[in-house]
């Protein structure tokens, strides 16, 4: 992984003596890859790349976005029309969001069709299902943030769905909306979920997912 010139340098040796960099490097680069692996086994990694792009572009937009019902739409227009390369950053964010969902769906189908969910990888599959739910939740909450007509009515419909659940349905709707109707509290909740709660959740479950894949390796052919 590292050239001889790098490994012979005093700086590298100093770090290697303390962190065992060479052992970590050897473990990463010497992992066995089965011969049946093809491009479709890269779909999970592509999903991760899309998430990283989402995180970077989303973080950039938080400097200008205002999560209020009076300023949200105007702040999005400001990003698109006034901020340098703002239109590009938001466009990349939107397109990578669609790509992330698509790659996630294809990844789920690939794992299912190749039997990657079977013993001993049941927990890997379960964390993957949780990641899929979080990914879709990202899309639902992010869709509302521009607070335009499409976003507003999408929130109104989505947040009203739990009302069909017996006993606790109305309480769930009120919890999602922050009140009886869609308004500022709803936007605040969706913004908090989209920019804080879901990123932490997806990071934790991604780490678990990758550690289990690393431990168990890639599943064999059918």
From Swiss-Prot:
Q: Does the keyword Lipid biosynthesis apply?
A: no
Q: Which GO terms describe its molecular function?
A: electron transporter, transferring electrons within cytochrome b6/f complex of photosystem II activity; metal ion binding; oxidoreductase activity
Q: Which SUPFAM superfamilies match?
A: Transmembrane di-heme cytochromes (SSF81342)
Tell me which family the UniProt entry assigns to this protein. Belongs to the cytochrome b family. PetB subfamily.
Query: Which amino acids does the record list as binding heme c?
Result: 42
In the UniProt record, the signal sequence range is none
What is the protein name given in its UniProt record?
A: Cytochrome b6
How does this protein sit in the membrane? Multi-pass membrane protein
Which compartments does it reside in? Cellular thylakoid membrane
Task: Identify the cofactor(s).
Answer: heme b; heme c
Transmembrane residues, as ranges?
39-59, 97-117, 123-143, 193-213
Sorted alphabetically, the keyword list is: Electron transport, Heme, Iron, Membrane, Metal-binding, Photosynthesis, Thylakoid, Transmembrane, Transmembrane helix, Transport
Which residues does the annotation say bind heme b 2? 93, 194
Q: Where is heme b 1 annotated to bind?
A: 107, 209
Q: What else is known?
A: Heme 1 (or BH or b566) is high-potential and absorbs at about 566 nm, and heme 2 (or BL or b562) is low-potential and absorbs at about 562 nm.
PROSITE patterns per record: CYTB_NTER
């Amino acid at each position: 992984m590292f050239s001889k010139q790098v490994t012979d340098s005093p700086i590298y040796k100093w770090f290697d003596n303390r962190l065992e960099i060479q052992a970590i490097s050897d473990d990463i680069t010497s992992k066995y890859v089965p011969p049946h692996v093809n491009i479709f086994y890269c779909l999970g990694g592509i999903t991760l790349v899309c998430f990283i792009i989402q995180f970077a572009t989303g973080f950039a937009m938080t400097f200008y976005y205002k999560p209020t019902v009076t300023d949200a739409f105007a702040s999005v227009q400001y990003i698109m029309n006034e901020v340098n390369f703002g239109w590009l950053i938001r466009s990349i964010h939107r397109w990578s969001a669609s790509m992330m969902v698509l790659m996630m769906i294809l990844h789920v189908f690939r794992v299912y069709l190749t039997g990657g969910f079977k013993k001993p990888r049941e927990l890997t599959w379960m964390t993957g299902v949780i990641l899929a739910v979080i990914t879709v939740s990202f899309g639902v909450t992010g869709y509302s943030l521009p607070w335009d007509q499409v976003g507003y009515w999408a929130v109104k419909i989505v947040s009203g769905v739990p009302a069909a659940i017996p006993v606790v349905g109305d309480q769930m709707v009120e919890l999602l909306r922050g009140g009886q109707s869609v308004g500022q509290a709803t936007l605040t909740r969706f913004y908090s979920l989209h920019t804080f709660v879901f990123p932490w959740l997806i990071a934790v479950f991604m780490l678990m997912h990758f550690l289990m894949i690393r431990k168990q390796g890639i599943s064999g052919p059918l």
